[in-house]
Regions:
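Short glycine/proline-centered loop/turn elements that form peptide/ligand docking sites
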Residues: 96-97, 174-177, 188, 192-195
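Conserved SAM-binding loop
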Residues: 13, 43, 109-112, 170-171
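Active-site flanking residues adjacent to catalytic metal/cofactor-binding acidic residues
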Residues: 7, 171-172
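Substrate-recognition "cap/lid" segment bordering the active-site pocket of phosphatases
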Residues: 88, 116-169, 175, 179-183
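Hydrophobic/aromatic residues located in beta-strands of well-ordered beta-sheets
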Residues: 109-111, 138, 168, 188-189
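N-terminal helical cap/lid subdomain that shapes the substrate entry/recognition surface
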Residues: 2-96, 100-105, 118
Length: 195
């Protein structure tokens, strides 16, 4: 029986893949003079935390100060892209209805996302996420959580809900996120689908 629901955010509740890819491409060219292939997005960027992606793009280990500066620069580009495209900057169709229904059923909800704090602050304000999610149940990339496909984001989200991971249901769109949910033993008797 499902006792709590955990959502990935980017690509799941908010389809921002075009905005993310545009921002990553602009950022990678400005900072590393390199392009990013569709295959790299699929396997090495979508669903991953910024530390992993930035070190991959840089081709070397980065200091915390370098990662922080690069994250701020990339996410500033991303937020600017979103703000210039209000027609495509909204929660996915049906998301609000689903969240309202889950809240009405008193199911505890959490978010487990590789997005950094700068983006979380933007999303909370832009989408009024506090209607459904307590701030302490939004697990984001603060630099201390091992990135997906490691189970850490989902385990921390289940812990925030005060539930065993096996009693949670996850909504996720990225291969690395599905692997993370599986690795966390989320919904032990659930099935995993990739679209």
């Amino acid at each position: 029986m499902v006792k709590g629901v955990i959502f990935d955010f980017n690509g799941t509740l908010f389809y921002d893949t075009p905005q993310q890819e545009k921002a990553w491409r602009e950022f990678a060219w400005q900072n590393f003079r390199r392009d990013i292939s569709d295959q790299e997005f699929k396997e090495l960027i979508h669903g991953r935390n910024a530390n992993f992606t930035l070190e991959y793009l840089a081709g070397r280990n980065l200091s915390k100060a370098e990662v922080d500066a690069y994250v701020k620069a990339k996410e500033t580009v991303y937020i600017d892209i979103c703000e210039k495209d209000p027609q495509n900057t909204h929660l996915n169709s049906g998301a609000e209805r689903l969240l309202d229904e889950l809240k009405e059923r008193s199911l505890p909800l959490a978010i487990a996302t590789a997005a950094p704090k700068i983006n979380i602050d933007y999303y909370i304000k832009k989408f009024n996420l506090e209607r459904w999610f307590s701030l302490d149940k939004i697990i984001y990339n603060d630099g201390t959580i091992k990135g997906k496909p490691a189970p850490d984001f989902y385990l921390k989200a289940a812990q925030a809900l005060q539930l065993d991971a096996k009693d949670c249901l996850v909504f996720e769109d990225a291969i690395s996120g599905i692997q993370a949910a599986y690795n966390a033993n989320i919904g032990k008797n659930s099935r995993y689908y990739y679209h």
